[in-house]
Amino acid sequence: MANISSPFGQNEWLVEAMYRKFRDDPSSVDPSWHEFLVDYSPEPTSQPAAEPTRVTSPLVAERAAAAAPQAPPKPADTAAAGNGVVAALAAKTAVPPPAEGDEVAVLRGAAAAVVKNMSASLEVPTATSVRAVPAKLLIDNRIVINNQLKRTRGGKISFTHLLGYALVQAVKKFPNMNRHYTEVDGKPTAVTPAHTNLGLAIDLQGKDGKRSLVVAGIKRCETMRFAQFVTAYEDIVRRARDGKLTTEDFAGVTISLTNPGTIGTVHSVPRLMPGQGAIIGVGAMEYPAEFQGASEERIAELGIGKLITLTSTYDHRIIQGAESGDFLRTIHELLLSDGFWDEVFRELSIPYLPVRWSTDNPDSIVDKNARVMNLIAAYRNRGHLMADTDPLRLDKARFRSHPDLEVLTHGLTLWDLDRVFKVDGFAGAQYKKLRDVLGLLRDAYCRHIGVEYAHILDPEQKEWLEQRVETKHVKPTVAQQKYILSKLNAAEAFETFLQTKYVGQKRFSLEGAESVIPMMDAAIDQCAEHGLDEVVIGMPHRGRLNVLANIVGKPYSQIFTEFEGNLNPSQAHGSGDVKYHLGATGLYLQMFGDNDIQVSLTANPSHLEAVDPVLEGLVRAKQDLLDHGSIDSDGQRAFSVVPLMLHGDAAFAGQGVVAETLNLANLPGYRVGGTIHIIVNNQIGFTTAPEYSRSSEYCTDVAKMIGAPIFHVNGDDPEACVWVARLAVDFRQRFKKDVVIDMLCYRRRGHNEGDDPSMTNPYMYDVVDTKRGARKSYTEALIGRGDISMKEAEDALRDYQGQLERVFNEVRELEKHGVQPSESVESDQMIPAGLATAVDKSLLARIGDAFLALPNGFTAHPRVQPVLEKRREMAYEGKIDWAFGELLALGSLVAEGKLVRLSGQDSRRGTFSQRHSVLIDRHTGEEFTPLQLLATNSDGSPTGGKFLVYDSPLSEYAAVGFEYGYTVGNPDAVVLWEAQFGDFVNGAQSIIDEFISSGEAKWGQLSNVVLLLPHGHEGQGPDHTSARIERFLQLWAEGSMTIAMPSTPSNYFHLLRRHALDGIQRPLIVFTPKSMLRHKAAVSEIKDFTEIKFRSVLEEPTYEDGIGDRNKVSRILLTSGKLYYELAARKAKDNRNDLAIVRLEQLAPLPRRRLRETLDRYENVKEFFWVQEEPANQGAWPRFGLELPELLPDKLAGIKRISRRAMSAPSSGSSKVHAVEQQEILDEAFG
């Protein structure tokens, strides 16, 4: 009989075989067995082993048998053994001798163990319970699981994994099934083990080809979650096949699982070995026998599912039939229960709800066709809510689901999965199985990419997206996968080096979001594939250095020089900026194509999203400059320069300039043919979680306002990131619209490298700290899916290490530069001497004529017609007002070949109905732009100039940023932005502070943008009075911009022309008039346009003409702007010859030489006053009060101020109070 006291049970043969090998050669046995085998004593056999014997002749056998003495047969012993087994059954039965030619062999090893074990099993009185369990839910959920694993990490879950785990859970409810019988001191005893150790029968093939069966145990199963159980299961099987099992693996099995169903057996009653209380058998999954001849369609129609037969063979001495039956019933219920499958899915990180068990719905197939179509529509509208896009999965208990996406919500069940329904062209078919429909829908909308396009109103765009998204994605080739991996290698290598070399330095690392590098690379590559000219990138500081190195191609040496604190020697002047704000330019070459494309990264400040409108303006300027093939095959502009804009999630949702910039997307004056937006969504804003930083479901919801498609993509899936990037470019090219990619990722470190994010986000960073990076995860996924081999992965790793080494080598060769104080940029650009801004009278006349050169049949508005006639009159006779003086400047520049762009709120007509640059037909609405006629010479040839004038949206931040960007993209253009009232320019203060006033000093980025800011105290209240002169003067330094407040149309004319023609790229700020627009004295004569140039300091005309006597003047009033006309009127009224008024037309840089020359003409002056309308703490005085005495200490050391009192608001809200204050200023000035 078997040695039932052995802890190895049916594995005893293997132990004995190992012992014999160990005895002959200890080195032939795994060292883990040595300690056990030294003390092992095998059970002695009852007979010596014999070699196989071939019987040569029946006759010899008969004679041998006859010669042997024969004992009479004993009567059979019918006494029952103590365990109820009839002893006679154990007696050897006489067997006829083998026939001639038969091969006779004594059974050894596993075969002998089977004999011994089976004989031993006869001592266990067993009974068997049988239960048929529906297998459909098991089959369907396993399909879902394995499809997800195939897409991600690879591997499979077997039916045995699931059944074994259900068995273990059932044992928890019925612990008696885990007991076994023994005798202690001759007394029958039931033993309840402390743990459930599940025995698995593993079929092994030896080197000689013979197969053997071992039973290894998974220990302490009741303590495991499903993922742990699967890991332990796979470990046992792997070590068994590798011959690495230890003594511990064989000992202590308490309950066994056998699966003869794998060979087609439907029902099995296995033998139960001593030492166990039960063995569970699993039969084959089959349809009921009576349906096995039915077609698949008929089976689906009837709702027939496969069954699996479970048997429980148990020791009847300690387990009763009711317990065994309930045990099987519990397994049955588990395999159909929601809770069991929820746990399995969570443990395997399957982000979707499992298929649910339900009864079949008897509704008609016609009704269900409609339900299937509703389900398809639901996935197209809501599928993104179920997409597996979060690489952190912080809420692991939450499934990605939505009621609209559940088949049960639509009156469908798992029984409908294999039924065929009408799908009306979905995925190119008229009829499909629901299973296939669901598979396609989930693949399209619910995997690592979530697509939002239901908000798009254009059916063509929606259909295009559906066709592209619902088509099976073409898997990248091995070469493409290796290329993606190489980009991840480069991204991670760069960050790893910086982290080790420059510990603690701020660099705003890309770690956790490395997939943005292959994503950007793919987008640029696709742009090159389309034959476009350039990609211009705008982005914040997060990951900027990585983009500079691995996308734009900025040399590592330059980047590391900046890390060392050295400015680029080519930018010796200026204050410079931190390394993660700088721009660069490079050339991108396709890896798998023959095209190339220019790539540039524009400089940015730390003000998040401020660069957005700047980028759009820069791109529009480049497009206008190229102007080649301006109409594509679809009759649209060929927008061959592509803006690629990166954002952070918190900033995209939180910064208002994002909405302002998006609003520009489809406007005629601002359209760039679509921007590719990539949101690096690390799911945190500094320390703020999304639930505190936005009210919307997604950070991208603001983009729905312009009908942009939105793609949410898992940053841990670089292949999905690459696919989405290419699709985004294709959509942009097809429809000339914005596209938004929301790449969900995480931030490996804090907001900067010195910050500890776990202080405020501990749970998130517990997850992040243990998470593999995208490069490692992708490598493992490629190997797990079988896409690349281990060798190829090792080659990629060597490439990664090689790139690290290359970085180190470049750093070693860096030359250190000595740090010097920064120098001013003021002297870098000087006004050329003798610059002429006057024009010929004939050009003035031509511009005047243009306003009456209306197209045939054009009817001007009756209130506009007199204005046009007056302009023609002024062009010939003089008395030119402010508005026409401005148009003369712009028109003359167009005639000289300049591109002139004017924009602003209501700028075509003018806020004060003064400009009328675009005329509207009173009856047809047709538009006519007179100054555009100046783009053609009198002989019909083009001048090369253009006049572009646009009414802007009601925006300052984005509008000013756009115009600034336009000047960066086209330095030769004359670009003007006009505020509706100067007060509102503070809506663009970030652009003024970060770009206009300091861009040259920080980045060497030049701009000649013009801001026209209506300014003046006229009693219209504090919000329609001041353009905040004091703020611009405070920002001025190093010649960073020109600030002017001209008081005559001709001086304004020359100021604009000087700015356009002097070759200096610096902004111009002009404080323009309001009431002075129609002031009768504020006019200029023709000679003022044809004979002189801009004058930064103006005297009164009486002194300039030699009429006034300067020697009588004892007081000088210095002033600017329209206040001059009020002072001049009061002087004339009071007949004050002792007082002169001098106008500073240019406020910065202060015209020191001109001012001195002017003041020196007045030899008897004793008092100097600065007179302004603005309060004492506003206007020019806060700067002039300090600067004028330093500028001319011999004259202006004692200069005094005349103004309103210091005020917190620019003016009073009462027009009557305004009039009183204005009178007080005049009275004091003439007191």
Curated annotation (Swiss-Prot):
Region (Disordered): 24-56
Active site (record annotation): 316 (proton acceptor)
Residue ranges with Basic and acidic residues bias: 24-37
UniProt-listed Enzyme Commission number(s): 2.2.1.5, 4.1.1.71, 1.2.4.2, 2.3.1.61
Binding site for 2-oxoglutarate: 581, 606, 1024
Residue span of region 2-oxoglutarate dehydrogenase E1, C-terminal part: 338-1231
Cellular component GO terms held in the UniProt record: cytosol; oxoglutarate dehydrogenase complex
Catalytic activity: glyoxylate + 2-oxoglutarate + H(+) = 2-hydroxy-3-oxoadipate + CO2; 2-oxoglutarate + H(+) = succinate semialdehyde + CO2; N(6)-[(R)-lipoyl]-L-lysyl-[protein] + 2-oxoglutarate + H(+) = N(6)-[(R)-S(8)-succinyldihydrolipoyl]-L-lysyl-[protein] + CO2; N(6)-[(R)-dihydrolipoyl]-L-lysyl-[protein] + succinyl-CoA = N(6)-[(R)-S(8)-succinyldihydrolipoyl]-L-lysyl-[protein] + CoA
Region (2-oxoglutarate dehydrogenase E1, N-terminal part): 1-41
Needed co-factor(s): Mg(2+); thiamine diphosphate
Positions annotated to bind Mg(2+): 649, 682, 684
PANTHER family reported in the protein's UniProt record: 2-OXOADIPATE DEHYDROGENASE COMPLEX COMPONENT E1, 2-OXOGLUTARATE DEHYDROGENASE
Family: Belongs to the 2-oxoacid dehydrogenase family. Kgd subfamily.
Protein name: Multifunctional 2-oxoglutarate metabolism enzyme
Source organism per UniProt: Mycobacterium bovis (strain ATCC BAA-935 / AF2122/97)
